[in-house]
Amino acid sequence: MTTIAVVGATGQVGQVMRTLLEERNFPADTVRFFASPRSAGRKIEFRGTEIEVEDITQATEESLKDIDVALFSAGGTASKQYAPLFAAAGATVVDNSSAWRKDDEVPLIVSEVNPSDKDSLVKGIIANPNCTTMAAMPVLKPLHDAAGLVKLHVSSYQAVSGSGLAGVETLAKQVAAVGDHNVEFVHDGQAADAGDVGPYVSPIAYNVLPFAGNLVDDGTFETDEEQKLRNESRKILGLPDLKVSGTCVRVPVFTGHTLTIHAEFDKAITVDQAQEILGAASGVKLVDVPTPLAAAGIDESLVGRIRQDSTVDDNRGLVLVVSGDNLRKGAALNTIQIAELLVK
């Protein structure tokens, strides 16, 4: 008898988790949903029955003792407070926030890349990577295995859903506010008022913001999204000295993160070799031109536009473009795939 819990079940990623649990026929006899007091008491249809959402603030170790796996997507603050409680009650927690990713005693797992790390549990918690890192890892791991990855230069073009529901609502409202005046931006960037900037530094509608995430106050002038890309890539690939430089850009796309990756390797690797490797890689789909619209709603990371990097000698550099659904594989799906590994 397996019992699974979804914490943050009514949120943006939680909704996708519920859908995927049904689609994948996850082997659970009992499912419990948790959310904040604001959403507690709601009834959600799941597998033909209605399940009442429980108030996470009322949870106790005793009330949680039947749970085997808990999928968390309730934000870092809630995870820090409640994930240890679920773990103490006997559950293995798979957390989608950034709360535990840098903890040396918490494995950071991409199901296709380092699944065996699930056996190294100290705190009863497994961390899910950031959605941008997630898109890249199934692509980079098999290339690393073939040629030895030594350096990454990455630019990411991240959808507004990566900022949560506030990002989605902000873009939709700004597009509506500008309306038919949008073509006036051709000659004047101030031609129309997009309204409230929401969670961003400037209007996102009809714009590109080279500032995704929050500025880290450590003198590097990097955002937390850019540092996550470096730190998480090193941890997942087991390459603590991997050189990673990233610029994370927010773009007016609802779902789907796209990355341009300049990868340098220890050994030569040609475009033909890379295509052959990636064509056989798990969690990867080889296409001519990856786009966020094409990636939205599918499980795989799309990879294409593969070229030799002419700035790296001896055919040791590749340029690739990757697109991935930041809500699906970038968050919900990988969490569930980890849970599937746990209950096998």
From Swiss-Prot:
Gene (name only): asd
Stated name of the protein: Aspartate-semialdehyde dehydrogenase
Keyword terms, alphabetized: Amino-acid biosynthesis, Diaminopimelate biosynthesis, Lysine biosynthesis, Methionine biosynthesis, NADP, Oxidoreductase, Threonine biosynthesis
Taxonomic source organism: Corynebacterium glutamicum (strain ATCC 13032 / DSM 20300 / JCM 1318 / BCRC 11384 / CCUG 27702 / LMG 3730 / NBRC 12168 / NCIMB 10025 / NRRL B-2784 / 534)
Pathway: Amino-acid biosynthesis; L-lysine biosynthesis via DAP pathway; (S)-tetrahydrodipicolinate from L-aspartate: step 2/4; Amino-acid biosynthesis; L-methionine biosynthesis via de novo pathway; L-homoserine from L-aspartate: step 2/3; Amino-acid biosynthesis; L-threonine biosynthesis; L-threonine from L-aspartate: step 2/5
Keyword Oxidoreductase: yes
Subunit structure, as described in the record: Homodimer.
Pfam families per the UniProt record, alphabetical: Semialdhyde_dh, Semialdhyde_dhC
Single GO BP term: 'de novo' L-methionine biosynthetic process
EC number, UniProt record: 1.2.1.11
InterPro entries documented for this protein: Asp-semialdehyde_DH_CS (IPR000319), Asp_semialdehyde_DH (IPR012080), Asp_semialdehyde_DH_beta (IPR005986), NAD(P)-bd_dom_sf (IPR036291), Semialdehyde_DH_NAD-bd (IPR000534), Semialdhyde_DH_dimer_dom (IPR012280)
Catalytic residues as annotated in Swiss-Prot or TrEMBL: C131 (acyl-thioester intermediate), H257 (proton acceptor)
Positions contributing to substrate binding: Q158, R250
